[in-house]
């Protein structure tokens, strides 16, 4: 009789349950603390949580050097500037208004600054930052030069339109457009082929993984990005008919690249030794009077 009572009591008592049913835990006899079952943690949710924790990079937040919201705003602004400039250029050309030069110059600048960031983000992701757009990080002289170019366009077109017949012939505009396209293409190609070896700021110390690129466009030009920018900039001034800024661009850019190449190559010889010396001997710069 007692046996039956015991059996009945056990049957009616609430079940403690198996902890392995309600949660992915294993309880061992030697420990009262549940242990995480390693076979149950490799789930999409667990993987997402681990990745989310790893992505807590302060530079990606607003105000950071790689701020995603900042990148979005910059890209949107450049796209808006490009679209509106193209439409305004077409309208002013249709009206035979010489001021078409101003929006066309802005359109070219918009493409340049977008491609600077895009090429960096696409082929050199670790170096991609807000500053890669080069909108506000390319030096005060750069911004002053383009501001002066815009002012010359407005002043000449408004007060001295007859001067354009002298300095802006159809052939010079065609040559300018050709130089812009060639220069932009070679610069972007150079950034793509250099990959992570490209940097907007010349390296002064040899970092691990930095290689000397000698393939592709680097097989003919040892500084193709400088070549591209030099002729791109001159092309913009030929296209818009800026005589004063055109001459100033040539002089300032030649001086800038002459000094920069000389200083940069001193470090490159230190980094790569005889390999760079031989590379320098068989390639050129293609900027007048810079060897």
Kindly give the residue locations of the regions a language model identified.
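Membrane-anchoring alpha-helices and their flanking helix-loop junctions
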Residues: 2-208, 235-291
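Active-site-proximal inter-transmembrane loops
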Residues: 201-229
């Amino acid at each position: 009789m007692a046996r039956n009572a015991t059996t009945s009591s056990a049957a009616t008592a609430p079940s403690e349950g198996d902890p392995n049913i309600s949660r992915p835990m294993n309880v061992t006899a030697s420990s009262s603390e549940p242990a995480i079952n390693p076979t149950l943690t490799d789930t999409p949710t667990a993987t997402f949580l681990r990745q989310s924790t790893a992505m807590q990079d302060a530079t990606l937040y607003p105000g950071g050097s790689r701020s995603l919201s900042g990148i979005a705003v910059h890209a949107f602004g450049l796209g808006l500037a490009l679209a509106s400039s193209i439409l305004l250029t077409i309208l002013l050309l249709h009206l035979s208004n010489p001021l078409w030069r101003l929006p066309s110059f802005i359109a070219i600048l918009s493409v340049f600054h977008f491609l600077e960031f895009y090429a960096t983000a696409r082929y050199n992701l670790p170096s991609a930052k807000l500053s890669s757009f080069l909108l506000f990080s390319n030096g005060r002289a750069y911004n002053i030069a383009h501001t002066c170019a815009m002012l010359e366009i407005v002043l000449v077109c408004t007060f001295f339109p007859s001067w354009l017949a002298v300095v802006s012939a159809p052939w010079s505009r065609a040559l300018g457009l050709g130089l812009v396209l060639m220069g932009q293409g070679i610069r972007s190609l150079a950034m793509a082929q250099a990959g992570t070896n490209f940097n907007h700021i010349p390296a002064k110390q040899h970092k691990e993984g930095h290689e000397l690129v000698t393939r592709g466009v680097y097989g003919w030009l040892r500084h193709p990005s400088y070549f591209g920018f030099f002729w791109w900039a001159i092309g913009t001034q030929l296209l818009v008919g800026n005589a004063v800024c055109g001459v100033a661009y040539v002089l300032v850019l030649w001086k800038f690249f002459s000094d920069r190449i000389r200083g940069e190559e001193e470090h490159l010889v230190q980094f790569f030794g005889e390999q760079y010396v031989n590379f320098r001997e068989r390639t050129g710069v293609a900027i007048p009077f810079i060897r």
